[in-house]
Amino acid sequence: SKSQEEEKRILEQYLGKNSSLVKDKLGEPSQIIFESPYKIYVYKKSQMIVTCERRFYIEPKKDLIEKFDSKNCINK
């Protein structure tokens, strides 16, 4: 969908960047998960009747974002 494409385009900007950039833009994560080999920042936000969840997978040694995942996030 167009909304999912927009979400992907927005989140792709963080790939290869330092994890502090995500915190500067989105604030402190709702949760931090340590799942080898990644440190995962989880951001949750309610949007109408669904909860938007974004996950950023950070390579801890270099502190760089290597991938992301997004569920139920709507960009208007």
Regions found by a protein language model. Name each.
Residues 1-76:
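Residues within mature, well-folded domains
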